[in-house]
């Protein structure tokens, strides 16, 4: 008599779902993974284009007085914090992935929250790829109109994804979570 093979354990969130709900959850995950992949590819493409077409340190105006593309290499984080400390970025990126994975498990039926986590993940992957390949991140977007307030930040598409993702998560925490608690 043949022994029945034990079934492969499913992630905690999927164990309590019915088969149709599990299929819907798997499809939902696929959509978010595809969105993240498109964002990572877009980030990769923009950075590659800038490295090829704009010499290091040079700028090209996109909208005069508003935004330009300035090719720089950033070995730090936002505002050049932790400059040159690559080990710090490797560790924090891996920790960020672990935290996002834990938060994802508890985010069933929270699409706004999940989109925030997806954006954060895509941005983290985009910058992580640069750090692994070059030991720096290619930044390019310079908001000229902020220079008058001595805010001379230059950032990349991955940074935009991370920032928008954090905004999505904060909006969920401040507004949507309260609605769910009342219901």
Feature locations, PLM:
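Alpha-helical transmembrane bundles and membrane-interface segments of multipass inner-membrane proteins
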Residues: 2-183
């Amino acid at each position: 008599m043949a022994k029945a093979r034990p079934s492969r354990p499913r992630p905690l969130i999927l164990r309590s779902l019915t088969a149709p709900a599990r299929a819907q959850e798997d499809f939902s995950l696929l959509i978010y993974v595809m969105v993240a992949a498109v964002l990572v590819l877009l980030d990769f493409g923009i950075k590659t284009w800038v490295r090829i077409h704009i010499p290091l340190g040079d700028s090209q105006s996109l909208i005069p007085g508003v935004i330009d593309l300035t090719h720089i290499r950033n070995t730090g984080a936002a505002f050049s914090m932790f400059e040159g400390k690559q080990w710090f970025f490797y560790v924090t990126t891996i920790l960020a992935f672990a935290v996002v994975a834990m938060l994802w498990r508890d985010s069933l039926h929270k699409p706004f929250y999940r989109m925030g986590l997806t954006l954060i993940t895509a941005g983290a992957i985009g910058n992580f790829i640069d750090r692994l390949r070059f030991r720096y991140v290619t930044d390019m977007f310079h908001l000229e109109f902020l220079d008058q307030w001595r805010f001379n930040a230059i950032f990349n598409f991955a940074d935009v994804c991370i920032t928008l993702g954090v905004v999505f998560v904060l909006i969920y925490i401040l507004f949507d979570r309260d609605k769910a608690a009342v219901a």
